[in-house]
């Protein structure tokens, strides 16, 4: 019988040099990828997904890692090849798309230059043939205006365009295996859907095998023929995608399917991996009666924040002699925010969500319109006058990695705003307050002296939340606060935000591109597109009967 396997991984083990074999980072990993097959490798951060991918390309540092087992690619054991033999395989036969295209692309070279460089290094083509090949691939990844695109630098194109460029780069040498390591994690759900469809189409047209790595099981199910579930360096379950969804055996697999917010029902609390795995979760559905009662309570009082006809534009200029273009970021925005409400702002990147948040915080000044907070017109205040209101309006950032100062420990990060406003000055009181805040966000006093690099993504975001609530604000703006996190960690952070809202009666402005998350969290939503509010209202009603095509597009993009 003919062997149809392109890649066979047999009993792969990876452990740190000088460590015990009993503490393997990858433990007895075995799987196959057939020719023209898409295999999904799914697990949480730290499960060993990326380590497996790097092992396949033999990119692990021999001084740091020891590997054993076999990785057979076209019947050659990759772990036994020389450097010259490996270099012939990397890029030519096995290619890789990375999670963060901005860090994978060279910021000092334009897109065309980077594509040409790869062709000259790996392919025996003349200049005309190289240009022809690049133009063909750019069309295949569905990018427009090729001539101008090739002149641009990475910072001048969107996240979705960067990822398409990365896909084009990965296909330049006609590989037979494409490893896609979290290629859609940082993207809007609509762009995510487009990239998934693009990979599916290219897999067929280019006769590719694909190893698609992700933390999102619902997303991988839409793409993969076979799914492998990995946890703590070991494979816990694998099988055909549809069978695995319908007949998952391992509690961990079932938990991965359950943590994403439901499109159909609203739960008081999202299931978490830990509770599902320990059979310790009982779903409590928010009934229509209870929801109506809660909404009546919120909207029976006057709003605490009112925005009237806010407009904001930016001037862009491509060169010294080019004419100025005006980009309208916000156009006649009107909204009311009520005490105890969670108001959702949802839309794709560039729709104006974050610009609106910045105008509320007076980081950006609007050109016209009013922002009234508890009777005070914020747009008329000077920077000094606004300081006392900044205590009341706090922000949780999207990226927990860049929002914390790497040189400051957790304790100092949390108490910094408290010291600035001189709420507490005694050192013992400040430390006690930091401990209280850590406990509020589900962390212990053991974290006080840790630095950001010693924390996981979820822990970093909890520290960011602790800092945001340290001043007892009235309004908290959550700007894509969970979009950089695994779906499993997302569920924990969303539960935490709702718990804190109940405890302290916070009012949230919840910004997201993911309508399923917004539906779970919000009492009311505004759908934004190109600086305009397309649609607004009760998210449950909008989900059932959206009025605008753009809203339908966002709903259809949910995995």
PLM regions and their residue ranges:
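Conserved catalytic motifs of ABC-family nucleotide-binding domains
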Residues: 174, 472
